């Protein structure tokens, strides 16, 4: 870059004649040809930062040289970017102890993988088959979200709780608790678990008998008011088939439902001996609502 700037300085020095050259042509050869080129060559990479810090003072003084002002403003922008990047916090990976956790799949299949937040949803881990598909993972404490890939199909296990993300996709999650005694053996952990179980109460509750419950034989107990069933959540009270369509000409087009309404069975009151059932499912970005009607004899 220094060579290029010196060449530009030489061309400018030859192109623009000085005042001495116009008055005394004999002394034109004695005048130094590249005073501006020397000033530009002397600017190094370290000097740019110093010029950037002094750019505000130069703007207040209002120098006549525009090229120097442009150079200082560019260098000041460079120093601002370096200060912003130096202020960013670097991500520190988790260095604490991990908890050995067994993840099990009991839904069958030939090839089963699992992926989740513990691998940033980028790596698939294959499960080993014995009686069921299992894998032992070293997970950090906290909430871990994951999903199974069974024969190329994404599935959720009924053995773990499920939740939905912002787009309505289902996934399993697991609360991994930090164990203080990570060095304890498996036998010690199993002994602690089995000693806490009330074995006697469990055996008494599983006894069979031929006695009929009293509330089935006594008329007074049948007349007692049972507690009311819990009311439906507010988002399930609004059925999509009862909403007004945006297109009056085409009644088959329905508005997009809330993701909590998916895979719920809705039933209408039996009127005129017809039973109506409906369910809404999702396939990628499309929603399909199916209504079924059947004759019902009261």
UniProtKB/Swiss-Prot annotation:
**Comp. bias (Basic residues):** 78-91
* UniProt name for this protein: 5'-AMP-activated protein kinase subunit beta
Gene3D superfamilies, per database record: 6.20.250.60, Immunoglobulins
Please state which protein family the record places this protein in.
Answer: Belongs to the 5'-AMP-activated protein kinase beta subunit family.
Q: Name one Pfam family in it.
A: AMPK1_CBM
Q: What is its main location?
A: cytoplasm
The major lineage groups are:
Eukaryota, Fungi, Dikarya, Ascomycota, Taphrinomycotina
Listed GO CC annotations: cytoplasm; cytosol; nucleotide-activated protein kinase complex; nucleus; plasma membrane
Tell me if Ligase is a UniProt keyword of this record: no
């Amino acid at each position: 870059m220094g060579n290029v700037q010196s060449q530009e300085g030489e061309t400018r020095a030859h192109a623009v004649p000085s005042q001495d050259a116009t008055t005394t042509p004999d002394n034109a050869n004695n005048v130094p040809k590249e005073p501006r080129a020397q000033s530009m060559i002397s600017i190094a990479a370290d000097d740019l930062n110093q010029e950037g810090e002094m750019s505000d003072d130069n703007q207040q003084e209002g120098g006549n040289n525009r090229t120097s002002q442009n150079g200082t403003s560019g260098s000041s922008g460079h120093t601002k970017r370096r200060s912003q990047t130096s202020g960013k916090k670097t991500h520190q990976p988790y260095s604490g102890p991990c908890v050995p956790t067994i993840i099990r799949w009991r839904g069958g299949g030939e090839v089963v993988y699992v992926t989740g937040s513990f691998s940033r949803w980028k790596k698939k881990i294959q499960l080993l088959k014995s009686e069921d598909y299992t894998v032992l993972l070293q997970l950090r404490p906290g909430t871990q979200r994951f999903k199974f890939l069974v024969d190329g199909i994404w599935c959720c296990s009924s053995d773990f709780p499920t939740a939905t993300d912002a787009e309505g996709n289902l996934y399993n999650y697991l609360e991994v608790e930090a164990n203080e005694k990570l060095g304890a053996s498996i036998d010690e952990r199993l002994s602690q678990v089995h000693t806490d179980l009330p074995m006697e109460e469990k055996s008494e509750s599983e006894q069979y008998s031929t006695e009929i419950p009293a509330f089935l034989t006594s008329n007074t107990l049948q007349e007692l008011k049972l507690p009311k069933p819990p009311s439906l959540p507010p988002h399930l009270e609004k059925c999509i088939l009862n909403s007004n369509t945006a297109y009056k000409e085409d009644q088959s087009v329905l508005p997009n439902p809330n993701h909590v309404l998916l895979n719920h069975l809705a039933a209408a009151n039996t009127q005129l001996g017809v039973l109506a059932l409906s369910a809404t499912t999702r396939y990628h970005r499309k929603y399909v609502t199916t209504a079924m009607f059947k004759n019902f004899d009261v």
